[in-house]
């Protein structure tokens, strides 16, 4: 391998990413004795070689690549009931639900569960009309405080973004990162990173609401930077906190890569939903379905 390829291999090793090496210039450099020699001119062996290559790829792939982990289906017994609270606001796309909501509904259906979808103003009535208490209530983070207030103690509840903190990232580390909000001081820099590159609408969650709630909660004069799409600062040490979106448009590996970069830089990191729940004072309730994350968060707050 040349120097650039060596860098890639070293980085893959650091991130514990399995690598399958394919040499396409064996006449220039020997590939070693542990590979499979193939004559590219021999068409009769093409299918056999490709099938063997696919088999090798499956061998080194992680389990979550082959089998997608559940979003919420494992939190509720089969045949259980889930209530989902879906606000329809300026940011909601016309004529459809957003991806995390759609994926969560599908996941629950795959696990044989019943899903009831309501707007926030119809939630209380829907709850009263149920003959049996639901096993789980999930809401958009923006109405987490309303959900927590209207949901009887004993019924587990969380947010879509918290579910995606577990699906796409490290929920324990993200819960711990939320504890850093209380320690922010005047002049501290905070990075808000969003996977989407959409144009900000009125009262945009990332560019308007979170900064407003953050400053109101802390009472501090914070410097807030924004990053969108695949742009992510390489120098993270200047930040006291990174707030990453739920990552529904990114794969798990990319979100984990960002989390690991923050961890390496010693910078606390959390995500939109967990951050918003902390700012609204209901994070302990939202983390109830995830005991390990709840314990870590409580430890950070002490």
Model-inferred region functions:
Residues 52-53, 84, 90-108, 191-219:
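Short, charged N-terminal beta->alpha structural module
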Residues 229, 239, 244-280, 286-287:
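Cofactor-cradling patches in redox/metallo enzymes
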Residues 164-221, 227-231, 236:
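Redox- and metal-dependent alpha/beta enzyme cores, enriched for Fe-S-associated oxidoreductases
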Residues 1-44, 57, 69-74, 97-129, ...:
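Conserved C-terminal guanine-recognition region of P-loop GTPase G domains, centered on the G4
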């Amino acid at each position: 391998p040349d120097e650039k390829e060596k860098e890639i291999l070293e980085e893959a090793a650091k991130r514990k990413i399995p690598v399958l090496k394919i040499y396409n210039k064996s006449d220039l450099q020997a590939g070693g004795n542990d590979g499979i020699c193939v004559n590219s001119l021999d068409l009769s062996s093409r299918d056999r070689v490709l099938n063997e290559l696919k088999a090798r790829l499956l061998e080194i792939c992680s389990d979550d690549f082959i089998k997608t982990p559940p979003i919420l289906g494992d939190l509720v017994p089969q045949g259980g009931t889930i209530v989902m609270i879906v606000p329809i606001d300026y940011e909601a796309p016309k004529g459809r639900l957003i991806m995390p909501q759609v994926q969560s509904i599908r996941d629950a259906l795959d696990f044989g569960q019943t899903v009831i979808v309501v707007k926030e103003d119809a939630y209380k009535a829907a709850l009263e009309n149920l003959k049996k208490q639901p096993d789980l209530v999930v809401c958009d983070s923006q109405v987490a405080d309303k959900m927590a207030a209207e949901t009887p103690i004993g019924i587990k509840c969380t947010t879509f973004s918290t579910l995606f903190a577990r699906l796409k990232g490290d929920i324990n580390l993200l819960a711990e990162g939320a504890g850093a909000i209380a320690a922010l001081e005047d002049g501290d820099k905070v990075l808000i990173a969003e996977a989407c590159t959409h144009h900000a609408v009125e009262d945009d969650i990332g560019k308007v609401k979170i900064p407003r709630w953050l400053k109101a909660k802390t009472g501090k004069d914070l410097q807030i930077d924004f990053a969108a799409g695949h742009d992510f600062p390489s120098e993270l040490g200047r930040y006291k906190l990174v707030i990453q979106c739920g990552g529904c448009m990114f794969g798990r590996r990319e979100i984990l890569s960002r989390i690991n970069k923050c961890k390496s830089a010693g910078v606390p990191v959390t995500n939109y939903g967990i951050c918003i729940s902390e700012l609204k004072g209901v994070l302990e309730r939202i983390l109830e379905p995830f005991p390990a994350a709840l314990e870590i968060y409580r430890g950070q707050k002490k």
